[in-house]
Design a protein with these regions (language model features):
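Long, compositionally biased stretches enriched for glycine and/or charged residues
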Residues: 1-245
């Protein structure tokens, strides 16, 4: 690649912090900003608004970005209509899942060759395994690792997403520096929500599970949070005995 792009944040919630021409070192962020805002306003309108208001380009795309933003679920304003956010087609995805599972079972039983998998995009896993196992030297644009200072203004030890170097000694995070504080605060909220969810499940803590939902960006009132939790715990009671001691 002729362009060095660095993005950082939390899992799937990353922001381009720098973009440079590898040959000349030129900062390409002004060009990215210019070209993106020249696109039709109907293209990724939520990304456009967040880019404008926060100053960095959010990577996920509108239908994923909306999951992390606390102002995208209000039932009165209905921002999903303004930004043309559509739900996933659950029936379609369920069909794809069942088809894929049947196909894999056929391969496992020897009734189908694995040739169809050879060109499947690995999303980086294959390259990482190969370079660790065989002592290679690979630069990967995004991977999740514990924060050991690669993003110094996010909590130490939490899982963050940054570029990484991969070689025979393992996977090593690239230091990207601090995120702008408003963006860091959005990421911190996600990290706290994730930790509360883990702690709630591990401890069987109703209180922490409720706090997880109350802090999450997609439920807008306290009663709904409690109702969702109660319904979930009742529906999956047999799988969550720690909450029923």
């Amino acid at each position: 690649p002729l362009v060095d792009i660095r993005a950082a944040g939390t899992n799937h919630f990353t922001w381009i912090v720098s973009i440079h021409d590898k040959r000349t070192g030129e900062d390409l962020y002004p060009l990215l900003r210019k070209r993106f805002f020249e696109l039709d306003e109907s293209f990724e309108p939520l990304t456009r608004r967040v880019f404008r208001d926060f100053g960095l380009f959010p990577v996920p795309g509108d239908t994923h970005l909306c999951e992390y933003l606390p102002w995208m679920s209000g039932p009165v304003a209905k921002p999903w209509e303004k930004f043309n956010i559509r739900l996933y087609d659950w029936e379609l995805m369920a069909g794809v899942r069942d088809f894929s599972l049947d196909r894999l079972n056929e391969m496992a039983d020897g009734n189908m060759t694995i040739d169809g998998l050879l060109e499947t995009d690995s999303e980086g896993a294959l390259e990482m395994i190969e370079n660790v196992a065989y002592g290679g030297n690979h630069y990967h644009l995004a991977a999740n690792l514990p924060n050991v200072g690669q993003i110094p203004n996010l909590p130490w030890g939490t899982t963050v997403e940054t570029p990484v170097h991969v070689n025979g000694a393992g996977i090593h995070p690239v230091h990207v520096g601090p995120l702008p504080e408003p963006i860091a605060e959005l990421c911190r909220r996600e990290l706290i929500v994730a930790q509360l969810g883990v702690d709630a499940a591990g401890e069987g803590s109703y209180e922490k599970a409720l706090q997880c939902l109350l802090l999450g960006p997609v439920i807008m009132d306290m009663e709904t949070s409690r109702s969702v939790l109660d319904d979930y715990l009742q529906t999956y009671k047999e799988h969550l005995p720690q909450f029923w001691k």
